[in-house]
A protein has these predicted regions:
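Short loop/edge segments at beta-strand edges and connector loops
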Residues: 18, 67-68, 105, 159, ...
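ATP-dependent carboxylate-amine ligase
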Residues: 1-15, 33-39, 49-52, 62, ...
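Short secondary-structure boundary segments
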Residues: 67-70, 201, 223, 258, ...
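N-terminal leader/targeting and accessory segments in enzymes
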Residues: 1-111, 291, 297, 315, ...
Length: 520
């Protein structure tokens, strides 16, 4: 528990109405998580306004409400919290419920500062590693954690696939959770004696101030591509780039991909010590002599790491140059933990990342991969990489998420038409959009390759399970099939409901023989 009066010293506020001499039992920003004595912070989300949930928070036992002062209006009966659908009298909350109401200019900023203070600033009590980039955050986080664990460090993780507090693994809704959840997790890591935390830091997480009160000992920049632009994400690429660059002003050591064309913009105004990694340019850590090997149902990447005067041969089960970049970032981080070269090589050789180039096809004679590639850059990198293994045919199955960038659909369709031998267009997470419309927009991209002299070969199968079964039914020796877009996800989101659907499960069932006969 923390005393409210002490917590309020951590923020700038406009007013405090009610008794601030009270103990707080918890802090949260979702009304369903409120319990007796909680401090509830009202934040605005993409779809919901947290101020609308004040009545629910009060019913669940909230002791303190932190609200945006724009929603507090003076009336004849006193100040009221007013939204389009809700009106609550502040004095009645104080009189009838003994609730304290705090008004601030920015509730997200307040949530971050209050959360850090409530959990006693756990980020200051272990090494913090933050990883950002359009693609590769999850793989780099797993590679980094794997290397550090191989060296005997106790490592916590926060990222797209899961959080790990040193003892328990949990799935998370967002790549970078809300700040109250981040600091709760960090606090558990400290309790479980973690030496460090590896965290994926999304641009949205930075923009929404979820990491505002964390100073990272090491910040890693992987890459940036024109993605995540649109309603509910970033308004422009410049805004997206700026959000990514903020990590370099929030860390002690910045490790950057020297080959990314926007690296100088990422470093603009940086306050950190800078190190770099590269395949194409002289850098602190480099990779060269890369080559790829396809066995019976397996793919391997081989390369040489060059660091100062040292050279080491490395083998990974993760295919492709983009994964070599991810490995270089992880190796660069490991250098600050004095990890032995053999430990680095051993960790990289065995690391598997759920839903990231995950090979499902041992012994099948062909390779069936599941990958999270869900934008043009990641799909292009993936398909170009798989081409280097010289498969008999390269078959790709993918869709695009609804309520996300529309341009992404054409771009991914064009990329698939240009790089794959056969494409199966299917449904991803349509969310609130018509899946058929999304598939048609992907098809437009495939057809667009005709202008470049390519005649794309493809089929549309809306049912994702049926699309996988169709791919397995047509698979031949030395084919590579890749199911892209959802990776580790265990659901399909349709009109606000998440239905159970796990690519790994449906692929395994298809490979085990549950394939229907198709006539197309």
């Amino acid at each position: 528990m923390q005393l409210l009066r002490s917590l309020l010293k951590q923020i700038s506020y406009e007013s405090v109405r009610g008794d601030d001499d009270r103990k707080i039992t918890d802090i949260c920003c979702h009304s369903e998580k409120v319990k007796e004595g909680s401090l509830f912070v009202c934040i605005n989300g993409y779809r919901n306004n947290g101020h609308e949930y004040v009545p629910q928070a009060v019913e669940h036992g909230a002791a303190v409400l932190v609200v945006d002062d724009r929603y507090v209006i003076e009336s004849r009966s006193g100040p009221v919290i007013l939204t389009e659908h809700m009106k609550v009298n502040v004095y009645e909350l104080i009189r009838d419920r003994n609730i304290c109401v705090v008004t601030v200019r920015d509730t997200r900023k307040a949530l971050s500062a209050l959360s850090a203070a409530f959990f006693d600033h756990p980020a200051e009590r272990m090494k913090m590693i933050g990883i950002t980039g359009t693609n590769g955050k999850t793989t780099t986080a797993f590679l980094t954690a794997g290397i550090l664990q191989e060296a005997g460090y106790r490592v916590g993780m926060i990222g797209t696939i899961e959080s790990y507090d040193g003892r328990r693994r949990e799935t998370v809704k967002n790549t970078t959770p809300e700040s109250c959840e981040i600091h709760r997790l960090l606090s558990r890591m400290v309790e479980n004696e973690c030496d460090c935390c590896v965290m994926e830091v999304s641009s949205q997480g930075i923009a929404l101030q979820r990491t505002a009160d964390i100073f990272f000992d090491i910040g890693v920049f992987l890459n940036i591509e024109s993605d995540h632009i649109g309603k509910g994400e970033h308004a422009t690429f410049s805004e997206y780039l700026y959000c990514k660059s903020r990590l370099m002003r929030q860390c002690g050591i910045g490790i950057v991909n020297q080959d990314d064309p926007n690296v100088d913009k990422i470093l603009a105004g940086h306050t950190c010590e800078v190190e770099n990694f590269s395949i194409r340019h002289p850098s602190d850590v480099m990779a060269e002599d890369e080559w790829y090997e396809m066995g019976s149902g397996s793919l391997q990447s081989h390369f040489t790491v060059k660091k100062e005067w040292q050279r080491e041969e490395v083998v990974m089960q993760l295919p492709g140059q983009f994964n070599i970049y991810n490995a270089l970032a992880a190796i660069s981080v490991a250098g600050h933990f004095k990890v032995d070269r053999e430990q680095i090589k051993a960790a990289l050789a065995k690391q598997v990342v759920p839903g990231r180039c995950q090979n499902m096809s041992a012994g099948a004679g062909y390779v069936f991969l599941i990958d999270y590639a869900h934008n043009e850059m990641s799909l292009r990198n993936l398909l170009e990489t798989l081409r280097k293994f010289e498969p008999a045919r390269l078959i790709v199955i993918f869709g695009c998420g609804g309520n996300r960038s529309v341009l992404r659909r054409y771009q991914m369709g064009e990329t698939a038409g240009r790089l794959a031998d056969f494409t199966i267009i299917t449904s991803d997470n349509p969310r609130w959009e018509d899946p058929g419309r999304i598939m048609n927009q992907i098809e437009d991209g495939l057809r667009g390759t005709v202008r470049a002299g390519v005649k794309p070969s493809y089929i549309k199968i809306a049912d994702r399970r049926a699309a996988v079964e169709y791919a397995v039914s047509m698979a031949e020796k030395r084919d590579i099939i890749v199911l892209a877009g959802k990776g580790h996800e265990s659901y399909q989101e349709i009109k606000g409901i998440r239905y159970p659907l796990d690519d790994r499960k449906i692929v395994q069932e298809a490979l085990d023989g549950g394939v229907r006969e198709y006539h197309c």
